Design a protein with these regions (language model features):
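C-terminal motif of bacterial Sec signal peptides marking the signal peptidase cleavage site
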Residues: 14-17
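Sec-dependent N-terminal signal peptides
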Residues: 6-11
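Extracytoplasmic cell-surface/polysaccharide-interacting catalytic and binding patches
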Residues: 19-100, 107-209
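Positively charged n-region of N-terminal signal peptides that target proteins for export
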Residues: 1-4
Length: 211
């Protein structure tokens, strides 16, 4: 039920926000104009874990274009996110964000990594049941991303009562069927994280994902 609520709430957010930008939004982010805002300026109590600024992601390296551990959105999307956040806080939850605006340089980095089939540094953590050259075919990686418009974000819910993230069926950037919005079966433990050890945060940079 919680997963369904989040999906509906964020679908409403994106339906509202996508009317505001298109390609111009990405260009505005690049030139530093006011079309984009820092999410924490609008939703100050949001939790940020910008995975692509660090090395614990499916590539295993900081992603090109991620110069700071910040998250940007178009103003309209951020205002809509604030409304969602306020509703969730009343129910005892906070938003935790992994990614928002994604520069095209970052998308290009994913594509290059996807073509380097020998680089499987993070396979056991993010795609243990997938062959790497299937990631394009299954649409886990693409040459263009809705994130680059600045009105898309990746997030989860943080339960303020338990001080834990809500189980969404799979970890962030899990390349598997458990990540699909219509997944209804009981997820395998490996997809949810608790039985899968995390690698050290100081991983060596991969040679160099997601839509």
């Amino acid at each position: 039920m919680r997963k369904t609520f989040l999906f509906i709430a964020m679908a409403a957010l994106l339906a509202t926000a996508c009317n505001s930008g298109g390609k111009n939004a990405a260009e505005s982010a690049a030139d530093g104009s006011q079309a984009f805002v820092n999410i924490t300026d609008v939703v100050p109590d949001v939790i940020l874990e910008v995975r692509y600024f660090g090395t614990y992601n499916f590539v295993g390296a900081r992603i090109d274009g991620y110069l700071q551990p910040t998250a940007l959105l178009t103003r309209q999307a951020a205002d809509s996110l604030k409304a969602v956040s306020d509703d969730l806080k009343a129910q005892g939850y906070r938003l935790k964000i992994y990614d928002a605006y994604r520069p095209q340089r970052g998308v290009d980095h994913f594509v290059r990594w996807g073509k380097e089939l020998d680089d499987t540094l993070m396979k056991r953590y993010f795609y243990p049941n997938e062959v790497k050259d299937s990631l394009f075919i299954k649409d886990y990686i693409a040459e263009h991303s809705g994130h680059s418009r600045g009105s898309t974000l990746d997030l989860t819910l943080f339960d303020m009562r338990t001080e834990k993230e809500v189980d969404m069926g799979g970890t962030f950037d899990w390349f598997g069927s458990e990540s699909h919005p219509d997944w209804a079966a009981t997820p395998r433990p490996v997809a949810t994280g608790p039985t899968t050890p995390s690698p050290p945060r100081s991983l060596p940079t991969a040679r160099c994902c997601a839509k």
